[in-house]
Curated annotation (Swiss-Prot):
The keyword NAD does not apply. Residues 334-354 have a biased composition (Low complexity). A motif ('Ionic lock' involved in activated form stabilization) lies at residues 134-136. It comes from Lithobates pipiens. PROSITE patterns: G_PROTEIN_RECEP_F1_1 (PS00237), G_PROTEIN_RECEP_F1_2 (PS50262), OPSIN (PS00238). This is Rhodopsin. The gene is RHO. Belongs to the G-protein coupled receptor 1 family. Opsin subfamily. Keywords: Cell projection, Chromophore, Disulfide bond, G-protein coupled receptor, Glycoprotein, Lipoprotein, Membrane, Palmitate, Phosphoprotein, Photoreceptor protein, Receptor, Retinal protein, Sensory transduction, Transducer, Transmembrane, Transmembrane helix, Vision. GO terms for biological process: absorption of visible light; G protein-coupled opsin signaling pathway; visual perception. It is a multi-pass membrane protein. It is found in: Membrane; Cell projection, Cilium, Photoreceptor outer segment. It holds the Pfam family 7tm_1. The chain crosses the membrane at residues 37-61, 74-96, 111-133, 153-173, 203-224, 253-274, 287-308.
Length: 354
């Protein structure tokens, strides 16, 4: 056994020398030098410094401009809300515990931080699934007469919360548990032990299949079909410069979405799955800390990718920041056209990214 398992924690270090202590009571500087904990705290402070204003601006601009309250933007707004959960209820706690070198808020605080971090991440993930399905239905038209309306958007938002709660709530009630991970200053689902008392093995399998693999398959399928549909439309309308431009824009958008999704979650999921399938193997605290903390950056680039690349939202944001005037003079009509994706044929208004 290359780790030390306690009643409510797992330290990735053998206790042969007797130095291992509970991460709820003592600094964990035997796992890593104090300066490394300071780096984590500084990193979390940077995420808070960037995440709060970006996500606040997302919510504020949407509230200020009625034309942004479209069905599609409800899902984008949901991303902003869940990112706030991650920043306010997760990042602030992690920054504070990193400064102290251990999880100073005890087991209750660990469950609190782990729950909200998981909830925020899962809401974001399932929001991306709903976005992918919406893009697929509107652009590829598997149902010819279907129009994505406000009721569908609200159902999509409710769906993201239901699925997120289905992942984040069970550890609170005895199906798995939240424990400190990596350098022991942030909490997550227990991938480190089988812990039969809380049926940990079945929960981890359920989480990987239902809350990671299935969303990834859905997103890949929807955006793959979207790219094919756009290419077919461009081939049929070769003289249309606007369609060709729209094809490039949506292809770029899809590539950015897929790449950043993979960059954000695959390293964390891979490391967690490796640890779970290699119980008792030797690994250092940094092995889990780096991907876990990097995944938290999704609260920053999610709004950048899914909202800042939305031309209509971007124009409204500039107008808000510039006290009601847009110095760049972008035409709202063109912005509005990009959001009307329910037209009867695949055209610029359908394949634009917003």
């Amino acid at each position: 056994m290359n780790g030390t398992e306690g009643p409510n924690f797992y330290i990735p270090m053998s206790n042969k020398t007797g130095v291992v202590r509970s991460p709820f009571d003592y600094p964990q500087y035997y796992l890593a030098e104090p300066w490394k904990y300071s780096v984590l705290a500084a990193y979390m402070f940077l995420l808070i410094l960037l995440g709060l204003p970006i996500n606040f601006m997302t919510l504020y601009v949407t509230i200020q401009h009625k034309k942004l309250r479209t069905p599609l933007n409800y899902i984008l707004l949901n991303l902003g809300v869940c990112n706030h959960f991650m920043v306010l209820c997760g990042f602030t706690i992690t920054m504070y515990t990193s400064l102290h070198g251990y999880f100073v808020f005890g087991q209750t605080g660990c469950y609190f931080e782990g729950f909200f971090a998981t909830l925020g991440g899962e809401i974001a993930l399932w929001s991306l699934v709903v976005l992918a399905i919406e893009r697929y239905i509107v652009v590829c038209k598997p149902m010819s007469n279907f129009r994505f309306g406000e009721n569908h958007a609200m159902m999509g938002v409710a769906f993201t919360w239901i699925m997120a709660l289905a992942c984040a709530v069970p550890p609170l009630f005895g199906w798995s548990r939240y424990i400190p991970e990596g350098m022991q200053c942030s909490c997550g689902v227990d991938y480190y032990t089988l812990k039969p008392e809380v049926n940990n093995e079945s929960f981890v399998i359920y989480m990987f299949v239902v809350h990671f693999l299935i969303p990834l398959i859905i997103i890949s399928f929807c955006y793959g079909r979207l790219v094919c549909t756009v290419k077919e439309a461009a081939a049929q309308q070769q003289e249309s410069a606007t369609t060709q431009k729209a094809e490039k824009e949506v292809t770029r958008m899809v590539i950015i979405m897929v790449i950043f999704f993979l960059i954000c979650w695959v390293p964390y999921a891979y490391v967690a799955f490796y640890i779970f399938t290699h119980q008792g193997s030797e690994f250092g605290p940094i092995f889990m800390t780096v991907p876990a903390f990097f995944a938290k950056s999704s609260a920053i680039y999610n709004p950048v990718i899914y909202i800042m690349l939305n031309k209509q939202f971007r124009n409204c944001m500039i107008t808000t920041l510039c006290c009601g005037k847009n110095p760049f003079g972008d035409d709202d009509a063109s912005s509005a056209a990009t959001s009307k994706t329910e037209a009867t044929s695949v055209s610029t208004s359908q394949v634009s990214p917003a």
